[in-house]
Amino acid sequence: VEKFRAIYTWVCNNISSDSNQHNTVARMRRKFQNDSTALIKWNNEFKRHAFKKLLKHKKTMCTGYAYLIKELSFLANLECEIVDGYARSADANIAQLETPNHSWNAVNLNNKWYLCDATWSSGFMILDHIFVKEYNTGYFLADPLLFAKSHIPLQKKWLLNNTLIQNKHVVGPLVYGETFKHNSVPVGPEKMSVDIYKNT
């Protein structure tokens, strides 16, 4: 565990999130949402640009974080996978799953899989996508029940819990960094919108 913690902490503390890349990728995902072949082609071309920027400026977006964690884990002889899926936030994937918009990692430590998100651990965005660097350990080897409230994988196996239903948390309330920092798994309400009736 400590070997992986060293990799993860180094990445989170030395790489910054790039809002420009994020906005470009989000725009192109929307543009090609009905043409997966064109999206894959564009994505493969964009990867070269993204990795050059990662090396030169130590800035990237979620895919770069996930790729770097995976590659460094490989060099340390640790089994690690990139998980693609949906991140829930105030402006994405609230009542229904739209376009996949995020990548994170699953790592096998001592024959057990764990989930982590170096992008969200490294800091957060404010106002006009200004990145604030603030390390949050809560996304490191996170509780799968809590993780599923904001991270919904394309492949169900990466929920890491057979009792979780892939789309159940789409209508649930949002959870943010402080929830993860304190490993506090909210049990209710089940829905983000609660209907209130007068005189009933």
Where are these regions (language model features)?
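Generic detector of ordered secondary-structure context
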Residues: 3, 97, 167-168
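A sequence-level detector of short, solvent-exposed, charge-rich linear segments
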Residues: 26-30, 92, 124, 159
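Secondary-structure boundary elements
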Residues: 1-58
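Hydrophobic/aromatic-rich core segments of domains that either
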Residues: 63-146
